[in-house]
């Protein structure tokens, strides 16, 4: 009987498992509830201070951001809105002046016709040609692929939307290839003039955490950030009338003063109101709560 048991592989595995070290306990992630009250009681003073710092409106976002690139004389309303969408798609992880230059090259490629979905397709550019045109935009090949896919989709009328028009809903924009939440809320605001949500980019995500407006920074994995979490937390308490303003306000502030590394706290007009002021380190975040 004992010999038979020794020949049964299942028993030997079970015996080995008994001697194996116990698996480490699974660490549960604590979810931070979305706040409905301002986490930072001085947020109004902070925002007013940033407005003062940004009074000159001479940051890159002010002359090369999506709002600045919106040209009402650049074709029909459909063309203008399409160009806003293009600038948003080009902008991901790309500096504003590079985005602006890329959009202008797309406009020139379509001339004398205004830049629109059908006009861009009519140039006959394939993915490789458009990739070359977009250089040095970041992730140019992926963006060229998505742009052509979007053009082919928008050039045809569908679901009550006329040919050449971009979707006028959050859901419709999110269905487009390469278009995420950040781009969607920016396009809804700039192209359609509708305040549907906060556009949270790397500047808004970083500075909101530094100011104490949210506590959403991934300290364990700094390269794995979640701007969508920041958007939801900001929208939980920030009055809606500030949603449209907060993107350009913080983006320009981040471009000129509150840099990703080594922020210029000594030259900042709100350092006395900032819990992260003069903290040393790569990101200068406030103490962990």
What name fits each language-model region?
Residues 83, 87-90, 146-153, 165-217, ...:
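Catalytic DNA-binding helix-loop module of base-excision-repair DNA glycosylases/AP lyases
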Residues 1-166, 241-242, 249-257, 261-289:
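N-terminal polyanion-binding entry modules of DNA glycosylases/AP lyases
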Residues 120-134, 173-174, 225-235:
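Short, well-structured alpha-helical segments that form the helix of a local strand-helix-strand
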């Amino acid at each position: 009987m004992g010999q038979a048991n020794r020949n049964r592989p299942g028993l030997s595995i079970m015996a080995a498992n008994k001697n194996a070290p116990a698996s480490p306990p699974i660490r549960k992630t604590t979810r931070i509830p979305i706040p409905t009250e301002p986490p930072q009681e001085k947020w109004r003073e902070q925002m007013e201070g940033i407005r003062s710092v940004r009074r000159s409106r001479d940051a890159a976002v002010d002359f090369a951001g999506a709002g600045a690139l919106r040209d009402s004389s650049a074709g029909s309303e459909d063309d203008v809105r399409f160009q806003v969408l293009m600038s948003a798609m080009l902008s991901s992880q790309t500096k504003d002046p590079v985005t602006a230059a890329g959009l202008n090259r797309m406009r020139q490629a379509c001339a004398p016709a205004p830049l629109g979905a059908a006009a861009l397709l009519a140039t006959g550019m394939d993915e490789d040609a458009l990739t070359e045109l977009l250089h040095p935009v970041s992730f140019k090949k992926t963006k060229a692929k998505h742009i052509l896919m979007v053009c082919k989709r928008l050039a045809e009328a569908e679901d009550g939307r006329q040919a050449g028009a971009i979707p006028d809903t959050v859901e419709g924009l999110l269905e487009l290839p390469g278009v995420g939440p950040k781009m969607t809320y920016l396009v809804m605001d700039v192209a359609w003039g509708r305040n549907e949500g906060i556009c949270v980019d790397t500047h808004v995500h970083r500075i909101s955490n530094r100011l104490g407006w949210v506590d959403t920074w991934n300290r364990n994995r700094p390269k794995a950030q979640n701007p969508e979490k920041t958007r939801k937390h900001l929208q939980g308490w920030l009055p809606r009338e500030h949603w449209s303003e907060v993107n350009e306000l913080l983006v320009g502030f981040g471009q000129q003063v509150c840099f990703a590394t080594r922020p210029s706290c000594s030259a900042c007009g709100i350092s006395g109101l900032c819990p992260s002021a003069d903290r040393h380190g790569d990101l200068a975040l406030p103490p962990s709560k």
